[in-house]
Amino acid sequence: MHFSKFWPKKAIFVVYVKRQDMAAISNNEIKKVKALQQKKFRDETGLFIVEGEKMVEEALKSHFKVEDLYRKNDIGDEAMKRISSLSSPSPVLAVVHKPSDIYVDDVASVASMLSEGGLYLALDTIRDPGNLGTILRIADWFGADAVFATRDTVDVFNPKVVQATMGAIFRVKMHYV
C-alpha cells in the first residue's frame, strides 16, 4: 500500500521507539538508586551502593545480601551514568543490604564481640571518606577482627568509603559505638 494518498507529501512522522538502554531500569528505580548516595536514604532503606566488577564480586562472595544488580550491557551507558556516583561509571553496580549489627548501643554489647587474642581497631571522628576506606583496607591487610568507630565518624556506606576500601568492607566487621 502506498501512503501518499493518506498523508500529505510534507507530513512529519513521529515514531516512538522504546530506547533499548533504558528498558531494564525505570526512572523510579534510577531515582531510588541515585538517592542511596545520601546517608539519609541509606539509613532509611538499609541499602548501599557497590560499584565495580571486583567490588561487586566481593559483595556476592560475602555474607552481605545483594538486593539488585545493574549491568551497563543491560541498562545502557546513559542509565549507568545516572545511577553511578563515579565520574567514569563502571560496567556493574549492585545495591546491597547493610548488616543489621552495625550500630552497638552499649559497652556490654561491645565486650561480647571481643575475643581474647583478637585484633581490633578503635577510631574516633574520622571525617574523610577516603581515609576511612584506606583504614579499613589496612585493617583487612593486618587481619583485624573488627573496627569500632564513634558515631560521628563518616558513614562506612558512603560511596567514597566503599570505593576506597577496595572490597575490605566485606571482610572486616565495622561497628559504630
Task: Specify the residue positions occupied by each region the protein language model found.
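Glycine/small-residue-rich loop that forms an oxyanion/phosphate-binding "nest" at active or ligand-binding sites
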Residues: 75-97
